[in-house]
Amino acid sequence: AHKADSIAGTTRSAEKAEALARMGIKPLIYAEGGFTPELTGTLREATHLILSIAPGENGDAVLAELSRHGRNAVPNLQWICYLSTVGVYGDHDCAEVTEESECRPISARSHRRLETEKAWSRFGSEIAVPVAILRLSGIYGPGRNAIVNLAEGAARRIVKPGQVFNRIHVDDIAGAARHLLDAKAHGTFNVSDDEPSPPQDVVALAAHLTGVEPPPEIPFEEAKLSPMARSFYSECKRVSNAKLKGLGYSLRYPNYREGLSALWKTGLWRG
């Protein structure tokens, strides 16, 4: 396995920079509109690059900056990983989707993600560096899960017959990225757990774990939702992770029951 001499990470806030430092990660403050000399220098030394910044209306600001200088900006780079979203597939009427399925994004943010995937892949080809595109399902983990929503009074059991969502624990995102890094893999990979599930079932489990009554079920037609929340319910698909598992990756949390139960038992659900 690859062992890093050092790891650096960007953040937009001083508070999160301190948290990175406590984890042994060199923190770098990132702000769109240009790289600091420290960030430019770190990129010149970097051998592996993992990106998760969402593209804006004008595209990916990091890619735009690197593209100005090409290989000279990242002379030691050996591998690029771009974290995208399964939202690029759009709606498939609850059918299974693989990496070969047609991408037909609905939202503007998913359209931008798809275009950015293509742009990073082109950049990798131009500088002869392999690029792995990781299409992530709905992320949960410490501080971001149904137990937190329940504790804050924000959890709702909205029922739309047949609707399922796909999920992935944050530990499995890190695990999959590390596995693909060690394999020097390139191409597109779905990063999702084994069990697409109705969202109301996840809230019910959170209530069971915490020993409280679950909130009442609300028919989708009667639910008051923000435009973004409603957009999620306009898409339904079952994301296959067979390609990732075919490369030998074993999920730490293959379904939401195991992931949520572990968060509760360890107390890490709070973040």
Regions found by a protein language model. Name each.
Residues 23-46:
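Conserved Rossmann-fold cofactor-binding substructure of NAD(P)-dependent oxidoreductases
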Residues 39-82:
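NAD(P)-cofactor binding segment of oxidoreductase domains
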Residues 68-108:
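Conserved Rossmann-fold NAD(P)-dependent oxidoreductase catalytic core, especially the SDR/UDP-sugar
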Residues 93-133:
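Catalytic helix-loop patch of NAD(P)-dependent Rossmann-fold dehydrogenases
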Residues 139-149, 158-181, 187:
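Substrate-positioning beta->alpha
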Residues 174-177, 182-229, 271:
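Mid/C-terminal beta-alpha module of Rossmann-like enzyme folds, strongest
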Residues 204, 224-250:
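Conserved C-terminal active-site "lid" loop/helix of NAD(P)H-dependent oxidoreductases
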Residues 255-271:
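Amphipathic terminal alpha-helices
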